[in-house]
Amino acid sequence: MKKITVISASILLLAAAGSYAAPKKQKPVKIGIAKIVQHQALDDVERGVIDAIKDAGIEAEYDLQNANGDVGTAAQIANQFKSKKVDAAVGIATPIAVALATTLKTTPVIFGTVTDPVGAGLVSTLEHGERNITGMSDAIPTEQHIQLFKEVAGIKTLGYIYTSNEDNSASALELVKKGCREAGIELVTQSITKSDEVKQAAEAIVNRVDGIYLTTDNTVFSAIASLVNVFGKANKPIFSGDVTAAKEGGIFMASGFNYYKAGRATGEIVVQVLNGKKCAEIPVRFMTDPSDSDFLIDLDAAKKCGITVDKKYIDSANMIYQNGKLTKK
């Protein structure tokens, strides 16, 4: 009887020890992140997504993909994420987000920097997500930008280059048209389908306009250096809705949100989803806080274009490019 009691006690002790053993380490979640093309702004979004997830204490394995501006490649990436059974997929820019949403019917799809998610068919309303889809919009105040460009640079004819086969750019074009009508400015447009055409498009309109306005067209920004070179030689000003590219010099004025912060905002949505919240319950997020935005004036470019910038604009800018150097206030 004593032997049985000792054996029973030993079993109980082992059971108790087992109950206090360290829990098994959970497997890292699998997250696919794809961008339509590589340029600094989208790289910043990607970095922000990853940092937000890391800061939330979530261990993750990433499959990072770049479609190189090709819609067919975007579809292949979506199928790759499907076969790998990722726990969540992030689409940076409209074409890749649409490809993911088309292919992944049950996997959470979080889009980042999509100008018009309703127009792109990703969601039916901005009030909440759609089934397994939600995300962050990079809509910018186009009409205000055009009015500001007119006030500061005195332009009467405005150039605009857009990607004709990208939903994001088609939506932006309508806003540019509206902004020009309201400001009483003539609009000259040139369409492209790939980054190789950006320089040729810039050359086609540079002598017909007083300046050019850039929205967040990813194909244009993937070849931004060639456009800046063309307009720089002609001493014509550039206004950009993306501040990232302007930090290298040559772009007269830029106003837009910080893309790294936009990436973090997108990553925070991913964290919500990984923690159990349904995409359909999460509204589309916008970067509306003033601290999310930057305003840059390039005084070197202004001087080259013969533009005198009023002190009130210089005072309101949080970044000044002068004498080949960027200064942050």
Describe each model-derived feature in a short phrase:
Residues 1-4:
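Positively charged n-region of N-terminal signal peptides that target proteins for export
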Residues 11-19:
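Hydrophobic h-region of N-terminal signal peptides that target proteins for export
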Residues 21-329:
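Short hydrophobic alpha-helices and adjacent helix-cap/hinge residues
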